């Protein structure tokens, strides 16, 4: 029984190796021609046109990401970063304080009012004294 399982394992590995080698050989990019030089086409894009014809690729390839600086600033300069909220996207009314309010005590007076409000005091959101 162990020898039969060993034979099955060896044969399955052989079949997998055979399938893997034929799929690598079928790859259209595995050619003998030079990567940057083509003798039958003139111009810079001769190889790209040849590869497009061989693989049926239609259209242009996407550009790779560029990590060049978008601005023409010197490397020693830092970009100006605005401080505070953007007035275009965050409209702040003139009567609102510039800093968030700090509460001296909790919105509820004591723990008993929160635990058992009774019928006259329903549970709801805490009262906010100052809103933006």
Swiss-Prot record:
The keyword Aminoacyl-tRNA synthetase does not apply. Keywords: Developmental protein, Differentiation, Glycoprotein, Hydroxylation, Secreted, Signal. The modification Hydroxyproline is found at residues 82, 85. Residues 1-26 form the signal peptide. Belongs to the CLV3/ESR signal peptide family. GO terms for biological process: cell-cell signaling involved in cell fate commitment. Residues 123-132 have a biased composition (Pro residues). GO terms for cellular component: apoplast. InterPro entries: CLV3/ESR (IPR044962). GO terms for molecular function: receptor serine/threonine kinase binding. Glycans are attached at residue 85. Residues 68-132 are annotated as: Disordered. It comes from Zea mays. This is CLAVATA3/ESR (CLE)-related protein ESR2. The lineage of its organism: Eukaryota, Viridiplantae, Streptophyta, Embryophyta, Tracheophyta.
């Amino acid at each position: 029984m162990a020898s039969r399982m060993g034979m099955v394992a060896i044969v399955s590995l052989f079949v997998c190796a055979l399938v893997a080698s034929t799929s690598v050989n079928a790859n259209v990019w595995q050619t003998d021609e030079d990567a940057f030089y083509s003798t039958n086409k003139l111009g810079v894009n001769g190889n790209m046109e040849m590869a497009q014809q061989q693989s049926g690729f239609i259209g242009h390839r996407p550009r790779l990401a560029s990590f060049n600086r978008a601005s023409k600033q010197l490397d020693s300069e830092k970009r100006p970063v605005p401080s505070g909220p953007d007035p275009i996207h965050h409209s702040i009314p003139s009567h609102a304080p510039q800093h968030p309010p700090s509460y001296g005590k909790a919105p509820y007076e004591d723990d008993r009012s929160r635990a058992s409000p009774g019928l006259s005091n329903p549970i709801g959101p805490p009262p906010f004294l100052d809103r933006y």
